[in-house]
C-alpha cells in the first residue's frame, strides 16, 4: 500500500512540475503580472495572486477558493467562490478558462501572466 501511494505521488509530481503536493493547479505560488508589464511597479489592478492549495486566483480586492477544476491537456476550467476582502460579500462570477503554459505562466481571459516572485515589488 505504501509503495502504491509513493508511486502515485511521484507520478503526480512528474505530471505537474513545480506544483506542491496539495496544489490543485500546476503553478508556482506567488505574484503574477501581465506578461507585457514589469514586475516592479505593477498596479494592484494588474496583480494576480496564486497561493496554491485550494486558493484560486486572488487580487487586491478579492480572495477566492477553488470549488471545482476540470482539465483538458493544459487548459483548466476553474470554478471558484470569491469574496470581497473588505466587506466579505460574495463576488459572483462563472467558470474561468485558464491555459497553463508552464509553472510560471498562464493565460486567462485573453491576458497572459508571468511569475514575479512571492512578494509584490514596489
Where are these regions (language model features)?
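Short, hydrophobic/aromatic-rich segments at coil-to-beta transitions
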Residues: 28-31, 53-56, 72-79, 103-106
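Bacterial N-terminal signal peptides that target proteins for export
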Residues: 1-8
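A short, structured loop/turn motif at beta-sheet edges
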Residues: 23-27, 67-74, 99-103, 118
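Sec/Tat signal peptide C-region and signal peptidase I cleavage site
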Residues: 16-21
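Short, solvent-exposed loop/hinge segments that bridge or flank secondary-structure elements
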Residues: 22-63, 85-92
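Beta-sheet ligand-binding and adhesion/scaffold domains
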Residues: 38, 79-122
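Processing junctions and N-termini across compartments
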Residues: 10, 15, 32-33, 58, ...
Amino acid at each position: 500500500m505504501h509503495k502504491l501511494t509513493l508511486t502515485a505521488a511521484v507520478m503526480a509530481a512528474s505530471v505537474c512540475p513545480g506544483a506542491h503536493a496539495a496544489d490543485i493547479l500546476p503553478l508556482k505560488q506567488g505574484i503574477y503580472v501581465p506578461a507585457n508589464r514589469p514586475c516592479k511597479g505593477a498596479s494592484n489592478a494588474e496583480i494576480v495572486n496564486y497561493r496554491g492549495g485550494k486558493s484560486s486566483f486572488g487580487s487586491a480586492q478579492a480572495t477566492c477558493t477553488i470549488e471545482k477544476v476540470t482539465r483538458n491537456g493544459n487548459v483548466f476550467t476553474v470554478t471558484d467562490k470569491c469574496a470581497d476582502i473588505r466587506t466579505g460579500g460574495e463576488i459572483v462570477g462563472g467558470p474561468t478558462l485558464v491555459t497553463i503554459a508552464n509553472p510560471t505562466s498562464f493565460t486567462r481571459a485573453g491576458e497572459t501572466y508571468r511569475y514575479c516572485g512571492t512578494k509584490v515589488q514596489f
